[in-house]
Amino acid sequence: MLMSLTDSKEGKNRSGVRMFKDDDFLIPASGESWDRLRLTCSQPFTRHQSFGLAFLRVRSSLDSLSDPVKDPSSPGSSGLNQNSSDKLESDPSPWLTNPSIRRTFFPDPQTSTKEISALKGMLKQLQPGPLGRAARMVLSAAHKAPPASVVSPNNSHGEPDSSHPERAEPRAEEPNRKNNASRGKRRKVQEQRRPLSSSSSQPNRRATGRTKQRQQRPQAKSDGSGVQATGQCPICTGSFSIEALPRHAATCGESSPPQPASPTSLSSSESVLRCLHVALTPVPLIPKPNWTEIVNKKLKFPPTLLRAIQEGQLGLVQQLLESGSDPSGAGPGGPLRNVEESEDRSWREALNLAIRLGHEVITDVLLANVKFDFRQIHEALLVAVDTNQPAVVRRLLARLEREKGRKVDTKSFSLAFFDSSIDGSRFAPGVTPLTLACQKDLYEIAQLLMDQGHTIARPHPVSCACLECSNARRYDLLKFSLSRINTYRGIASRAHLSLASEDAMLAAFQLSRELRRLARKEPEFKPQYIALESLCQDYGFELLGMCRNQSEVTAVLNDLGEDSETEPEAEGLGQAFEEGIPNLARLRLAVNYNQKQFVAHPICQQVLSSIWCGNLAGWRGSTTIWKLFVAFLIFLTMPFLCIGYWLAPKSRLGRLLKIPVLKFLLHSASYLWFLIFLLGESLVMETQLSTFKGRSQSVWETSLHMIWVTGFLWFECKEVWIEGLRSYLLDWWNFLDVVILSLYLASFALRLLLAGLAYMHCRDASDSSTCRYFTTAERSEWRTEDPQFLAEVLFAVTSMLSFTRLAYILPAHESLGTLQISIGKMIDDMIRFMFILMIILTAFLCGLNNIYVPYQETEKLGNFNETFQFLFWTMFGMEEHSVVDMPQFLVPEFVGRAMYGIFTIVMVIVLLNMLIAMITNSFQKIEDDADVEWKFARSKLYLSYFREGLTLPVPFNILPSPKAAFYLLRRIFRFICCGSSCCKAKKSDYPPIPTFTNPGARAGPGEGEHVSYRLRVIKALVQRYIETARREFEETRRKDLGNRLTELTKTVSRLQSEVASVQKTVAAGGALRPPDGASILSRYITRVRNSFQNLGPPAPDTPAELTMPGIVETEVSLEDSLDATGEAGTPASGESSSSSSAHVLVHREQEAEGAGDLPLGEDLETKGES
C-alpha cells in the first residue's frame, strides 16, 4: 500500500487488502511452503514528491479473522498511550504510537500447553514432514513465553516498568553475551583461514570494541533520558531497546538460528506468519541487503591504499586491508555504519585502479578482504571489460554469484540507470558490461557474459508511454536518450549479432531497417543511427563473404527466416520463380530492406548473372555489337516468337524464351512497338489534319493504342496478384504505370462518352442543334469543357509519360543505369526545392500585384495570372525590366523597382545557384558510389524477370493460351476428384533447393532437414567471421607493438646521446646543473614508461621503474655521477648500452608474444622526477 509521509505519520489510508493466490508466485515456488515475502512497490517517479510503503502486515490463512486492527481510539490503545505518555513526550516517535507496532512488538501473553500443541498441529498441517525454520522459530517463541499470571499489566505490552530498571539490564546483556560469543567463534574460524602474513590482533580488538559498544549503548541512553525503554523480539525473545527493536526484528534469524530466550520474554501464538512488520518511510533505517544487491561497507578507506596499488606493493595492500588502519597514523580504522560518498568513490577507484593496471593478485586481495556492493562490482566489471581482461571478468562474476548464492540478477545492470553514484565514472549512461564488450568486439568476454545469463534488453519504441520509460524520461531525459543510443550500439555490434542471434544475417537486416526508421523519428541522433545502420549493412556484407562454396551460397540466399514471414517487407517473397530458378528469398528480402552493400556483393551478383543468362553461356562474354544484333532480331521477329510460345510453351522455343535475358528483350521489344504506334498516331494526325480538326474521325481510328493499354492493364493485375498490393505500390515504377494506365483509360472513356452522346442526340432528331454540336460543329464552336478537348489533353500527357517509362530498362547497361539513378536523385532534389521556390515566388507575387493593381499601367502587371507569368520567366532572364516603370507615380514606381530587383537577386542569384549546387551534390554522391547503386538497381530489374509466368509480352498476353486453359481444367479436376484430406496438404513454399552443380537434388530431404542445414551454414559463417576478426585483432596488436618498439629504440638512442654529453661535461670539469639534467632524463624515462605501460603488468612488490632493464641502470649510474660532485662517474659503455637496448627489445618482444590480453595503464603515475 503506497502512502505518503504524512499519511504514514497520521495512520491514514490503511485499508488496502491483497489476497495472494497460487498464480501470484513463480513456478518454482508454486505450491511450496514459504516463510518470507518480498514485495516490490512501484509508481510513476515524481522528483518533488516522496512516497513509500508505510506498514506491511502479512497474515496466513490460519490467522483468526476476529482480530481486526484496533483503532487508535480503542480502550487498549488509549490505556497504552496513557501509560507511556511520559516516554512519548521525551521521544516523540510517530511509529511508536501505531497500534500495529504496539500489538506486534508488545503482545499480550496467551500461551499455554494446549495452545502450543494446537499450534504444532497447525504447523504440521501447513508443512508435512520436518518442521522448517519459520515453524521452529514460532514454536521456540511459544515455549519461552511465560504464563499470563506471571506478567504484570505493564509488562503485557512489552515495556519495562520504570520503577524496576534493573530488571531490563540482565535481559539486554544475556542475548548480547551469547551473540558476541557466537561471533567470536566465527571470527576465530575466519582468522585460521587467513594467511600468516595477514594475522594480527586488530580484528579481535575491533570485535571486542563492537561488543562493548553494543552493551554500553543502552546505558548511555539511559543516562541521558533517565529511563531506558526496551522491548522484546517476538521471534527470538531477546530484549532490545525501542530504537533497535524494529531493525533487529527485520533481520532476526537471517544469519543465525534463534538464540535462547530470557524467562521474561513474551510471544504470541495466534498466527504463524503475522510477526513481520516493516517501517520504511517514517523511520530512517539502514535497509538490509536483499538478493539483488550487496551492501556491506565495513572498512574505512586507508589514504595510502591507492599509492600502494599503483606501486604494486602487495604486502602493504594486505596490511592496510587486514589491519583496518593506516600504518602512518593518518586515520583510525574500524567499522563504519554510514559510508559517505567520498568513501564509496575511493573504494571504487582502488578496485578499478588495480584492474586497470593488471594487478590480478591485488585485485584478488581486494575482493577477498573488502565486501564491495553491487554498484562497485558493476563499475569494476566495466573496467575489466574495457581493458580486455577475461580472467578478471570471470573472477568478478564468480564473486557476485558466490555472494548471492545464485546467478546474477542481470536486470540489475539495466537498473543502474537510476544510480547517480556512477555518474562520475568514465563510462557513458546505459553501458552495461555486455554492451561494452560488444561495442569493443570482445568475443571471449561477450560469450562469457552471455553464458552467465547477461542479455541486452532492446529499448522500447520512441513513443512508448510505459511506466519504465516515463520514469526514465522524468528522471533524466538526456541520460535516457544516451542510454538508448549506447544500447543500440551494443545491439548493432558485430559481437552481439554473431553471438546472440540464431540467424545473424536476418538479425542484421531487421536491425538495419529499425535503425533507419529511428533515424527518421529521432533526427537529434540521426548521424549516430545512420552510422549504426551502416555497421549492420557492413556486417551482412562481410558475413556473406565467408562462404566457401556454391552449396553454402545456395543455402544462405534461398531460405527465408521464420521471423520475417510476418514482417510487412516480407510480403510477396512467397512468389514462385521459373522452373529451375531458386527462390532467392533471402536476396529479395535484402532488396526490400534496402541492403545495397549485401545485394552488390560479388557473390550475389554472380548468382544473379548466372541465372540471368541461363543456358546462354556465351551471352556474358559476347561483344556489344553481337548483343545489339540479337536484340534487333528479337524486335523484328517478336510477333512470330510470341505466337510460337503461345502454341507450344513446353517446346524448345518455349523453354528458350523463358530465359530471363530473352524474356527481358521480348518485353522491351513489345514496349518499343507500342511507342512506335504512338508516334505513328501523331504522324497520322499531321497528315490528316482536316479529319482530326473536327469530329469526323471515329473512335477506333484514334484508339489503336488501346490494344497495348489493355495488355498493360492485364499485366499489372497479374503483378498485383503475384506480389501483393503493398509490395506492388512500394515500387515507384508501378505507381507510374498506374498513373499512365489511368490517364489512357480516362482519355478512351471520354471518347466513348462523346460517341455515345452523339448517338443518343441524333437517334431521334438528327437536325437538332445538339446533334449538330456533337457531329459537325467546328472546333471554334466547342465549349471549354468539351469531352474531346479533355481526351486530347490527357492523351498528350500520357504519351509523354509513356516515353519516360522507357527509362525502366536503362539499369541493364552500366553507364545508362548510373545516369538514370542520378536523374532520379536530381528530381527528388528539385521537388524539395520547389517548396522554397513557391514560398518566395508567392510572396513577391502578392507584393507586386498589390502595387500595380490600382494603376493598370502595363498588361503584364496588375493581373494575378499575368504577374505570375512575368515573375516566372524573369527567373530565366526572358522579361524586360522596363515593365515595372511608372514615371507619373514616383513612390509606387520606386517600391516596385526595389521589389523587382530584390526578387531578381534572390531567385536568380541565390536560389537557382543553390538548386544547381544541390543537383551537383546528388550527382556526386551517386558517382562516388556508382558501382553499388547500379548493381542494386540492376538486381531489382533482374529479379522482376525471374518470376514464374508473365512470359508473353503485351499485347499477346490478353489472348487465352492453351496452357492457361490446361491449368484451369486441371485445377477443376483436382477440386472435384481430389477433395479428400490427404490431398489438402499444403506444399512447402520453400522446398529443398538444388545446387548448381547437382540439379537433380530436388528430391532431397524434407523441409526440416533443409532448414537445419541452413542454420548450420549460418553458424559456420559466423564462426569463420569470429576467427577472422580475432586474427585481424592480433595482427593489429602485433603491428602496434612493432611501432612501440621502434619508438622505444629511438628514445633509448636519444637517452644514450644525452648520457654521453653529460659524461663529456663531467669529464671536462664543467659546471653541472643536476636539476636540469635530471629533468631531461626523467622526461625520457617517463616517455618510455608511458609507451610501454600497456605491454604487461609489473612484477609484484617491484616499483614501476624496475620493469625496464637497461634503462634504469643508466639512470642510476647517472644519478651516482651527479651526486659525486667533481668525480667522473663511469656509466655503462657504448657496448653495454647497445646490448641493454637490445636486451630491452628482446625481453619486451617475448613478453608481448606471451601476453594474451595486455591491460592499459593510463592512470599510472610516473616517478621520474625526484
From Swiss-Prot:
Family the UniProt entry places it in: Belongs to the transient receptor (TC 1.A.4) family. STrpC subfamily. TRPC2 sub-subfamily.
Known function: Thought to form a receptor-activated calcium permeant cation channel. Probably is operated by a phosphatidylinositol second messenger system activated by receptor tyrosine kinases or G-protein coupled receptors. Is not activated by intracellular calcium store depletion.
Keywords: ANK repeat, Calcium, Calcium channel, Calcium transport, Coiled coil, Ion channel, Ion transport, Membrane, Repeat, Transmembrane, Transmembrane helix, Transport
Membrane-side (Cytoplasmic) residue stretches: 1-627, 680-701, 759-788, 854-898
Chain segments annotated as transmembrane: 628-648, 659-679, 702-722, 738-758, 789-809, 833-853, 899-919
ANK repeat windows: 300-329, 346-376, 377-405, 429-458
Keyword Transmembrane: yes
One Pfam family it belongs to: TRP_2
Location of the region described as Disordered in the Swiss-Prot/TrEMBL record: 64-113, 142-231, 322-342, 1118-1170
SUPFAM superfamilies cross-referenced by the UniProt entry: Ankyrin repeat, Galactose-binding domain-like
Protein's GO biological process: acrosome reaction; aggressive behavior; calcium ion transmembrane transport; calcium ion transport; female courtship behavior; inter-male aggressive behavior; mating behavior, sex discrimination; negative regulation of male mating behavior
Signal peptide annotation: none
PANTHER family reported for this sequence: SHORT TRANSIENT RECEPTOR POTENTIAL CHANNEL 2, TRANSIENT RECEPTOR POTENTIAL CHANNEL
Compositionally skewed regions (Basic and acidic residues) per UniProt: 158-177
The protein's name in its UniProt record: Short transient receptor potential channel 2
Superkingdom: Eukaryota
